[in-house]
């Protein structure tokens, strides 16, 4: 093909997809039916993971719950079974341990079936200055926040590829696209999770596996135990997200097969400005929004010696 023909094809496709995206901005996509889909959620013992499990159960999905917290995971299972007649399977799994992930994954495939919607939600946060963060906490952040994604994909993607059917969901973070002070290990691991999921999305499309979808979620701080005590200076501009709002938004994005979900909407503005304004301007904006002090109370509890599950590596 010559350059002129290639360019004409490119412009035609580009215009088509541009108009398509505008259309879906006005008229949302029809939500897909997840009845009978096998949905695996990591970090299902509490918070966002629990809410997502409850919402998927209400849509007729078969739930597979993973968490290192056996008691909390069984509580999620009990809540779902009490509220509705749903198929729910709970497994204790340490997502930071590759062998444990593969072992429990094999168990799931034998006892439940092939996972068709995988939601990598488990996460940990330290919330300390870089030089005050112990090495084992840095390693833990990467093992849970991103390496577990590699292992769950390895375990469940082959069956999706064979059937050309599935959905991969990465719960990254706003801290996975914008650096935030005193979250160096968390930001790095969430940047990695975002990049991994995006890379795999394009790899699958080039393999012509168009029926395997990806959704990458980048929320600002959610009001869960993981970020308890964090605050925001101007809630109207950059609010702490409620668990209900975050869970419903994520569910809608999955059902509409949306690739990116960034919350709240103002985050889009911050991300755009990051590309065009100077570093000093970025710092000024961060100070104005209070992002430089948003972890103050979180850090203070750390310094006071209070035991926090979020720094002890508990998956949430």
Swiss-Prot record:
<dbReference type="Pfam" id="PF00106">
    <property type="entry name" value="adh_short"/>
</dbReference>
<comment type="similarity">
    <text>Belongs to the short-chain dehydrogenases/reductases (SDR) family.</text>
</comment>
<dbReference type="InterPro" id="IPR020904">
    <property type="entry name" value="Sc_DH/Rdtase_CS"/>
</dbReference>
<feature type="binding site">
    <location>
        <begin position="40"/>
        <end position="64"/>
    </location>
    <ligand>
        <name>NAD(+)</name>
    </ligand>
</feature>
<keyword id="KW-0520">NAD</keyword>
<protein>
    <recommendedName>
        <fullName>Short-chain dehydrogenase/reductase family 16C member 6</fullName>
        <ecNumber>1.1.1.-</ecNumber>
    </recommendedName>
</protein>
<dbReference type="GO" id="GO:0005811">
    <property type="term" value="C:lipid droplet"/>
</dbReference>
<feature type="binding site">
    <location>
        <position position="173"/>
    </location>
    <ligand>
        <name>substrate</name>
    </ligand>
</feature>
<feature type="active site" description="Proton acceptor">
    <location>
        <position position="186"/>
    </location>
</feature>
<keyword id="KW-0521">NADP</keyword>
<dbReference type="GO" id="GO:0016616">
    <property type="term" value="F:oxidoreductase activity, acting on the CH-OH group of donors, NAD or NADP as acceptor"/>
</dbReference>
<dbReference type="InterPro" id="IPR002347">
    <property type="entry name" value="SDR_fam"/>
</dbReference>
<dbReference type="InterPro" id="IPR036291">
    <property type="entry name" value="NAD(P)-bd_dom_sf"/>
</dbReference>
<keyword id="KW-0560">Oxidoreductase</keyword>
